Amino acid sequence: MKVLDRSAFKKTINVYSIEIKPNQINNLNKCLKNYYFKNRRCKITEEKISDNVKLFLNPALIKNFDDFSENTKIELKNLGITKDMFSNEIITLDYDYWKLNEVLKAILPKDEPPLTSYSIIGHIVHLNLKDHLIDYKYIIAEVLKDKVSVAKTVVNKTNKIDNVYRNFEMEVLCGEPDFIASVIEYDTKFEFDFSKVYWNPRLSTEHNRIVNLVNHGDVLFDVFAGVGPFSIRAAKKNCLVHANDLNPDSFKWLNHNINLNKKAKGWITTYNKDGSDFILNDFKSNMLKIWSDSNFLGQIHVVMNLPAKALSFLKYFKGLFDEQDLKEIKKDHLEKHLPIIYCYFFAKKDESLDEIFKTHLEYKFDENEYEFNFVRNVSNGKNMHRVTFQMPLSILMIDNSDISEPLPKRISKSLKAKTKAKEYTGNLKKIKETLNKNISKIDSDFLKLQNDISKKKEKPDDK
């Protein structure tokens, strides 16, 4: 079936039923509740007949009185319920009765994998249909709109998320092309245009994990903030947040959502930049302010949720600070407040997470200095992971050969080294000049010798 025919789902069945007075229901429930024909949207478990109520029993369990267990028969007898009070009745089940998976099972090919998942974003049902289901996309969408109570619009993703803004093209299969979605994640409301920004409801648990690590007095840098699932909830905990996203639509809805959630206002500064620019400039300048504040007692968190590319942005932390930047900062205060990085990435199931991570950062961590966490399955061959680690000062510094020494001492050594280097350069220049002069003299003497030998050969033999 490729065109939905709701009438095809009508079915008549024979059910065992009993008509009783309303005041008998509670007592009868005690012995018959496990036998009731369960209600599914349509009211067939019970039907009011004048002042009485008719109860229907599940035909898969009870077809006649003899199907009751002996204990149930005794309980019915004690309630004054006899066999004569039961009867068989024909009822009709229509399209509304059947569950979503039952309808899809009836209309889709039996020899192909079924529809396994879909996402709900406000009133939007989002599909990512496999190739073998494309021919059935419209009927699938229609059934979803019927059976998912909040559904008003059903869309299918038509391309991969491979553009710089992380959104994707989609096709409206059923309903109105209304993409302004409203969702509540835990205690926070978000609104956005789903066709222009990235939102994945399957990440709500991961958002919550990170937010639970953030406390009042902390600072969070959200490098790829999107519409704010990490940032806004962190700000509501009175954590100072710097939230950045390159996508102008994400930036727009990020600010909109800050206004929606009043508790977050005043705690977030927003940026509309490339992640590299944000790290090289805004992260750096704000880190220097934090490190310069001897009263700062919190933790610094950096969230990098761009799994397709986030690892490649780690290089922008390398050598971000030089000795001149840090000369006024106390070393012990600095080392107590190094940023904790939460970086997301994709990996094929047969790939080494260690190799992927270390290749991008090119730093030899000890095993206990970083941690991998599985986030979700993306496809049959790919998973999403998070690596969590504290960024070493030796990565953040340009010249880290003497990182263990106090900063003033290192600066002094650096200046001495520069002076010595100049001396060595001058000496090398002198040596080179002397060597060149010697080589020229040797060449000149050699040419003179050749000329003398040549002249002797030209003289006649006196003998």
UniProtKB/Swiss-Prot annotation:
S-adenosyl-L-methionine binds at H207, D245, L246, D274, G275, N305. Pfam families: TRM5-TYW2_MTfase, TYW2_N_2. GO terms for biological process: mitochondrial tRNA methylation; tRNA N1-guanine methylation. It is found in: Mitochondrion matrix; Nucleus; Cytoplasm. It is an enzyme of class 2 (transferase). Keywords: Cytoplasm, Methyltransferase, Mitochondrion, Nucleus, S-adenosyl-L-methionine, Transferase, tRNA processing. Its EC number is 2.1.1.228. GO terms for molecular function: tRNA (guanine(37)-N1)-methyltransferase activity. Signal peptide: none annotated. InterPro entries: MeTrfase_TRM5/TYW2, SAM-dependent_MTases_sf, TRM5-TYW2-like_MTfase, TRM5/TYW2-like_N, tRNA_Gua_MeTrfase_euk. It catalyses: guanosine(37) in tRNA + S-adenosyl-L-methionine = N(1)-methylguanosine(37) in tRNA + S-adenosyl-L-homocysteine + H(+). Coiled coil: none annotated. GO terms for cellular component: mitochondrial matrix; nucleus. Belongs to the class I-like SAM-binding methyltransferase superfamily. TRM5/TYW2 family. Monomer. Specifically methylates the N1 position of guanosine-37 in various cytoplasmic and mitochondrial tRNAs. Methylation is not dependent on the nature of the nucleoside 5' of the target nucleoside. This is the first step in the biosynthesis of wybutosine (yW), a modified base adjacent to the anticodon of tRNAs and required for accurate decoding. This is tRNA (guanine(37)-N(1))-methyltransferase. It comes from Pediculus humanus subsp. corporis.
